[in-house]
């Protein structure tokens, strides 16, 4: 998993509350269990005016020019600003996969659905909770000024706007450690490889009958 220490990125404002995982990545695109390849169909039903299906050439589809991610000011955005209860609905892990494959590194919202919030950390996507007032203030400036950028300092736990005071955010220390060091569940396990091998050797010595050939 890629380390997340500090990130400066363009902000895209998705001014919708209660965005569910089926809106993030529709169900017809969930046939793959790879973590990549979902970005082209992120928010598919909002980005396009026609119905999408797996394997389709998106270049030939009808684009919804009114949707924020299709607008020139937000091309290349890596920080998503949105409203409360983002990621509600089913527990599909494909939702953070799609957001990351599209290029997002962090999401800022007043609240997240619990399962989606946990899945983000497991995959290296940083979900940041700010107050309703701070999120509203960011919406005002981001929506009025194209190309607005924000710096996220994970170590200092701050969202740093182009103008104004830094906004502190809370994060669990263990999750922060994992993101700073690029550790997912597999990486955490591999960090303990020597201890695991030592334990297995001690088990063979203590309980040889368990490992005897039958």
Swiss-Prot record:
Gene: leuD
Keyword Repeat: no
Native organism taxonomy: Bacteria, Pseudomonadati, Pseudomonadota, Gammaproteobacteria, Oceanospirillales
Record pathway: Amino-acid biosynthesis; L-leucine biosynthesis; L-leucine from 3-methyl-2-oxobutanoate: step 2/4
EC number: 4.2.1.33
Gene Ontology annotations of biological process type: L-leucine biosynthetic process
GO molecular function ontology, one term from the record: 3-isopropylmalate dehydratase activity
Protein name: 3-isopropylmalate dehydratase small subunit
Assembly mode: Heterodimer of LeuC and LeuD.
PANTHER family per record: 3-ISOPROPYLMALATE DEHYDRATASE SMALL SUBUNIT, 3-ISOPROPYLMALATE DEHYDRATASE SMALL SUBUNIT 2-RELATED-RELATED
Reactions performed catalytically: (2R,3S)-3-isopropylmalate = (2S)-2-isopropylmalate
Homology family: Belongs to the LeuD family. LeuD type 1 subfamily.
NCBIfam families noted in UniProt: leuD, PRK01641.1
HAMAP family cross-referenced by the UniProt entry: LeuD_type1
Cellular component, GO annotation: 3-isopropylmalate dehydratase complex
